[in-house]
Amino acid sequence: MVAIDLGASSGRVMLASYYPGQQQLTLREVCRFTNQIKSIDGSDVWDIDAIEQSIREGLSQLDSEGIALDSIGIDSWGVDFVLLDKQGKRIGQPVYYRDSRTQGVMARAQQTLGSNAIYRRTGIQFLPFNTLYQLRALSEQQPHLLADVAHLLLIPDYLHYRLTGQLNWEYTNASTTQLLNIETGDWDSDLLAYAGVPAHWFAKPGKPGNTIGYWHSANGQQVPVVAVATHDTASAVLAAPLIDADAAYLSSGTWSLMGFESGTPLTHQQAQCSNITNEGGAEGRYRVLKNIMGLWLLQRATDELQIDDLPQLIEQAARQPACRSLINPNDSRFINPPNMCREIQNACREHQFPVPNTAAQLARCIFDSLAMLYRQVAQELATLRGRPISHLHIVGGGCQNQFLNQLCADACGLNVSMGPVEASTLGNIGSQLISLGEVADVTHYRRIVANNFPLHHLSPHDNSDFAAHWLQFQSLSQLPKELCI
C-alpha cells in the first residue's frame, strides 16, 4: 500500500507492508519533497503541478521496482481547493491559505450571518482562511472566474482525480471548510450562497473507505485509489494509540491540533466561546479540537535566520531562562508576517517582556509560549468534556522535539506519550487496510500501530516557572486579536 502524505511544508510517498499473521506493519520512505509556495500576480499559490509530479515520480519508482501495489491513498492539509472547468481542466492555481486575500472577510461574514448561526450550522472553529471565507473573497475579488467553473475539489480530492480521472469529495477534509452542515453532512446551501458559489460545484461528501478509481501504471498495474481520511489530522488521529476514553491527542507539526474524540459534536455556546472545532473523523467520530499555531513560528524563524541544525538550537534554547519572554502563538499577527522574528520581538516589546534577540532566545520564547497555550487549551477541553484529561498523546513530526514535549507535560501537568512520528501516513494506511478488509476497525488498527511503533513517555516535572508566569500568559491570551475569534 502507498500512503501519500502532504503536510503544509513537505510531502512524502511512503510504502507500507502489512503481514496479517504476525500483525506486523512496516514503513519505507520512497521519496520526500518540499511543498513550494509561488507568488503569481500578487497571490501566494501552491505549486500543485510540482506536488503532482513528485507523487508520480514516487509511484513510478515503486512500479519500476516491480512492487505489486494493493492500494493508494492521499491525505493533505485542509481548506485549500482547486477549481475545474467543464473539461476537467484546472482554472488557475490553488491559493495558499495564508494568502492575504481573506483579510477582513471572516469579520464581515460574522457580522452579516451572525457568528452563532455559522457555528450552529457547522460546528467549525473560526479561522480566517476557512474555505467559506476564501470563496467569499474569490467571488468578491475575481467574479469573472466563476462562470467557467464546473467543480471545486479540495487538494487530496484533486490529486485523486488526477490519478484516476474520477471526481470524489471526502468527508473529513470537507468538514474543515466551514461549508458543511453538521446535521446533514452535506454542503450548507445558505453558506454556499453567501460564499457566492453554486451547489452544483459539489457532490455530497462520502465517508472514508470507498474506492474512487484506479491508477494505471506504466507496467500495467491497475491499483485501487482509496478515499482515506484525507485530512491529515483525521489520519493522524486514526493512528493515535489513545490509551483510554479520557485521553487527548496533540498532532504536532506546522500546526498543533489538540483535542479528543467524541461520538457527538459539541456546538454549544461554551464550545463556540472557546473557538473549538468539530471536524469529521473516521467511523463517524468527531475530532473535537482546537487549532494552535504550532511549529510554524519556529519554521519561519529558522528559515529567516538560516539555521539548519535544529537539534543544536533546541539544546541552546533549553539553557535559556524559562518564561523570560512570552507571546500568544494564536495571535493573528503570526499567521503570515513579513518577518516572523521581528514580529515576535515586536509582540514582546509591546507587552513589556524582554525582547529575545538571539536565535536561542527566540526559540525559547516560542517553546515556552506554546507550552503555555497547550495548558490553556487542555483546560478548555477538559471543561467542555466535563472530566479531566487522563493522558496526552503527541503524534506527528513535533513528537521528536523532546524538550518542547517535556515543557508541554510540565505546563499541562499530564503524562505524555510521544509517537508515532509518521502518524498521518499510518492513519492513511489504516484507512486502506480497513477498506481492504485486512483490519476490522480503528480500535484494532491502533493496537497494531502501538505494537509496531514503540512510544516514548514523559512525566511532568514540578515546574514553578509555569505557575509563576501563568497569569502573565493568560493576560496575553485574552487579547481580542487571538487567532480567529
Swiss-Prot record:
Pfam families: FGGY_C, FGGY_N. ATP binds at residues 8-12, 254, 299, 397. GO terms for biological process: glycerol metabolic process; rhamnose catabolic process. It catalyses: L-rhamnulose + ATP = L-rhamnulose 1-phosphate + ADP + H(+). One of its GO terms (molecular function) is glycerol kinase activity. The active site is at 232 (proton acceptor). This is Rhamnulokinase. It comes from Yersinia pestis bv. Antiqua (strain Angola). The gene is rhaB.
